[in-house]
UniProtKB/Swiss-Prot annotation:
Family statement drawn from the similarity comment of this UniProt entry: Belongs to the protein-tyrosine phosphatase family. Non-receptor class 4 subfamily.
Gene3D superfamilies: Protein tyrosine phosphatase superfamily (3.90.190.10)
Name of the protein: Tyrosine-protein phosphatase non-receptor type 22
Regions of compositional bias (Polar residues) in chain numbering: 536-546, 713-744
Active site: residue positions: 227 (phosphocysteine intermediate)
Pfam families for this protein: Y_phosphatase (PF00102)
Species of the source: Mus musculus
Disordered: annotated segments: 330-358, 536-564, 597-619, 653-695, 713-802
Cellular component terms (Gene Ontology): cytoplasm; cytoplasmic side of plasma membrane; nucleus; perinuclear region of cytoplasm
Quaternary structure, from the entry: Interacts with CBL. Interacts with CSK. Interacts with LPXN. Interacts with TRAF3 (via MATH domain); the interaction promotes TRAF3 polyubiquitination.
Gene: Ptpn22
Length: 802
């Protein structure tokens, strides 16, 4: 158990005991019985104190020091001096003579008292009583008041150099002189502690002990503590200070007990902690110490977590282009020049994420890695997560730690979201060292930065003048041209060149900044973060399901259809129709910024599953429109350009430029349009799934009665015999239990469009089109058109008389 758990357990026990006062009474009764047994059985004898010549030196007859812990005086100033004084050594945390518990000096023992102070080189004296209490003399005055002449006690001269007044005690600076040697002694005089009673508050006692340890931190010399008899109030201070030392050094044992502590102290001097009220006071003081120390531990633990989360392992800070290397000391004040450099770099880093987005570094899956080759491999460093409002307070240091240091002239601010260390290292208080050559599984990848910013938002897309209906008509015609082929092959792209990737996104940067084949590898790990369709989905765009994927049907054996094996590019959805037999990536949504080739950035290598991507702007109806050149055919994709960017090492992507292809692809209408990473990529050792049977044009639509009848008339007069076969197989496929298609709320708007596609005639015979009576423009959203046909069986029985 660590100190935090031990303290929590002790706090619970002490709080339970405080609620039940009978436990205090029973425990203190045990202590009194134990002391009585010691005295009756003479387990700890007091032979020296009971000698006739020493009896007059004892203030109380029943408070006598034990022989085994007696303080003996060897410093002799005259022939009348003896070695006896009513004082006892009390064990401390690190030694058997940490405290000297003694009685208040008598008029006959003032010289003995200063002999003891001088011989044992006492630095701090704690006085817990008044000179007079209840009309009785409790302690002779052995100190001098400020401004008074020095007091003479035999050969000792005592004067007061200064006095510092506190609310409940005074701190006097005494100067003692003996044989031309002068020493400074500090006296802590507590004045508000009544005899056989307790103070009204424990805060002054704790403050007294705190100040006492400020003057003397260790137990190299004993601390002299006395009251009137040197047992009740003296024992309270010894017990509280003993516990304080354990807490300060973090060595509270599991079996710590106030009862055991006082019981042990009572074996060294009788009647320490003399009353039950004083015993309860010790418990209250110890409980308060535990609470305060728990707060300190919690603050330190939180500080270590923040330091661990902000730790930035770096190997070098060599910056390319015009920037100069950074050299920041760890614990020194930054000069104005260094502060300006960091402010400039913080402004650059802050501008990369825009006003609402932050640069998030997170772990990612291996199949989502893309490796870009740069001209040189310069030393890299990790980017701290930059969140709005606190990203300008990160200071990168040489030793790999980022300390929250405010800019000169600005107030301190709290970090609002420093939680990516919890995602990466869990609850570990310290960050793991990151090696760029052999990374830990959940570690961050190094990020290279050059003069330009890591990411740039793409330029605004030109406003499309086409209406929503024209956009869907264009999409309909394009789909019809695709589905007129006998089969649609979607080849899985294993390597996508950075030039083609930037070509597919408008406003791409100059590709000449980053050569394609250079020895230094610059890793850029992308992940797809597309929002769902805000028009056809009830879930918010920034939900956890916002990753783009195609919801494709899975086979019975659990394998994903080949259509799911699409390349995971940054927020792009591809239509594989290129008149030049090349792969064109038509961007449907481009909310995330593209890769800037001028910037050499290496993002994290892995991504945790529970991290939510940053919020994206809402989509507009124009974003669904894909504009292609009119009149160009859409042949089958049979080849692609040579590619440079590679996915993570998996059986499908082996690091070569050869592409894997699949025979067919199956699409299913889904609630959203997503680009899901295939299961075969998640398991790198698994084999690719087998291809699905060939799909036909009509199998991609939900067939109804009018569509089937119109298709029968159309296929009887068309010149494509294989279309008829595909239509028959499509109907059979729709009735197959294992190949059923799910309906989606987001595709209800396409119902009339599907009818028009199904009932449109072949392009070779435009004059023989058979239009169903219910066919109309899909832009007519009237109630009668939406619910014109009753729900029921395909062939209603004759009893219905329809």
């Amino acid at each position: 158990m660590d100190q935090r758990e031990i303290l929590q357990q002790l706090l619970k026990e002490a709080q339970k005991k405080k609620l039940n006062s009978e436990e205090f009474a029973s425990e203190f009764l045990k202590l009194k019985r134990q002391s009585t047994k010691y005295k009756a059985d003479k387990i700890y004898p007091t032979t020296v104190a009971q000698r006739p010549k020493n009896i007059k030196k004892n203030r109380y007859k029943d408070i006598l020091p034990y022989d085994h812990s007696l303080v003996e005086l060897s410093l002799l100033t005259s022939d009348e001096d003896s070695s006896y004084i009513n004082a006892s050594f009390i064990k401390g945390v690190y030694g058997p003579k940490a405290y000297i518990a003694t009685q208040g000096p008598l008029s006959t023992t003032l010289l003995d008292f200063w002999r003891m102070i001088w011989e044992y080189r006492i630095l701090v004296i704690v006085m817990a009583c008044m000179e007079f209490e209840m009309g009785k003399k409790k302690c002779e005055r052995y100190w001098a008041e400020p401004g008074e002449t020095q007091l003479q006690f035999g050969p000792f001269s005592i004067s007061c150099e200064a006095e510092k007044k506190k609310s409940d005690y005074k701190i006097r600076t005494l100067k003692a002189k003996f044989n031309n040697e002068t020493r400074i002694i500090y006296q802590f005089h507590y004045k508000n502690w009544p005899d056989h009673d307790v103070p009204s508050s424990i805060d002054p006692i704790l403050q007294l002990i705190w100040d006492m340890r400020c003057y003397q931190e260790d137990d190299c010399v004993p601390i002299c503590i006395h009251c009137s008899a040197g047992c009740g109030r003296t024992g309270v201070i010894c017990a509280v200070d003993y516990t304080w030392m354990l807490l300060k050094d973090g060595i509270i044992p599991k079996n710590f007990s106030v009862f055991n502590l006082i019981q042990e102290m009572r074996t060294q001097r009788p009647s320490l902690v003399q009353t039950q009220e004083q015993y309860e006071l010790v418990y209250s003081a110890v409980l308060e110490l535990f609470k305060r120390h728990m707060d300190v531990i919690s603050d330190n633990h939180l500080g270590r977590e923040i330091q661990a989360q902000c730790s930035i392992p770096e190997q070098s800070l060599t910056v390319e282009a015009d920037s100069c290397p950074l050299d920041l000391p760890k614990n020194a004040m930054r000069d104005v020049k260094t502060t300006n450099q960091h402010s400039k770099q913080g402004a650059e880093a802050e501008s990369t994420g825009g006003s609402s987005l932050g640069l998030r570094t997170s772990t990612m899956n291996a199949e989502e890695e893309l490796v870009l080759h740069s001209a040189k491999s310069s030393p890299s460093f990790n980017c701290l997560e930059l969140n709005c409002g606190c990203n300008n307070k990160a200071v990168i240091t040489r030793n790999g730690q980022a300390r929250a240091s405010p800019v000169v002239g600005e107030p301190l601010q709290k970090y609002q979201s420093l939680d990516f260390g919890s995602m990466l290292f869990g609850s570990c208080p310290s960050a793991l060292p990151i090696n760029t050559a052999d990374r830990y599984h959940n570690s961050k990848g190094p990020v290279k930065r050059t003069k330009s910013t890591p990411f740039e938002l793409i330029q605004q897309r030109k406003t499309n003048d086409l209406a929503v209906g024209d956009g869907f008509s264009c999409l309909e015609s394009q789909l019809h041209e695709h589905y007129s082929l006998r089969e649609l092959q979607v080849q899985r792209v294993a390597h996508v060149s950075s030039e083609e990737l930037n070509y597919s996104l408008p406003g791409a940067c100059d590709a000449s900044c980053v050569p394609r084949h250079s020895p230094g590898a610059l890793r850029v790990h992308l992940y797809t973060s597309l929002a769902e369709d805000p028009y056809f989905s009830s879930s918010p765009p920034n939900s956890a399901d916002s990753k783009m994927s195609f919801d494709l049907p899975e086979k019975q054996d659990g394998a994903t259809s080949p259509g799911a094996l699409l390349p995971a590019s940054s927020t792009t959805s591809f239509f594989y129709s290129n008149p030049h037999d090349s792969l064109v990536m038509n961007t449907l949504t481009s909310f995330s910024p593209p890769l800037n080739q001028e910037t050499a950035v290496e993002a994290p290598s892995r991504r945790t599953d529970d991290e939510i991507p940053p919020p994206l702007p809402e989509r507009t109806p124009e974003s669904f429109i894909v504009v292609e050149e009119a009149g160009e055919p859409s042949p089958r994709v049979t080849e692609s350009l040579p590619l440079v960017v590679t996915f993570g090492a998996s059986p499908e992507c082996s690091g070569t430029s050869e592409m894997k292809s699949h025979d067919s692809v199956g699409f299913t209408p889904s609630k959203n349009v997503k680009l899901r990473s295939p299961k075969s990529d998640r398991h790198q050792d698994g084999s690719p799934p087998p291809p699905l049977p060939e799909r036909t044009l009509e199998s991609f639509f939900l067939a109804d009665e009018d569509c089937i009848q119109a298709q029968a008339v159309q296929t009887s007069s068309t010149s494509y015999p294989e279309t008829t076969e595909n239509s028959t197989s499509s109907k059979q496929t729709l009735r197959t239990p294992g190949k059923s298609f799910t309906r989606s709320k987001s595709l209800k708007i396409f119902r009339n469009m599907k009818k028009s596609v199904c009932n449109s005639s072949s392009p070779s015979k435009p004059t023989e089109r058979v239009q169903p009576k219910n066919s109309s423009s899909f832009l007519n959203f009237g109630f009668g058109n939406r619910f014109s046909k009753p729900k029921g069986p395909r062939n209603p029985p004759s009893a219905w008389n329809m």
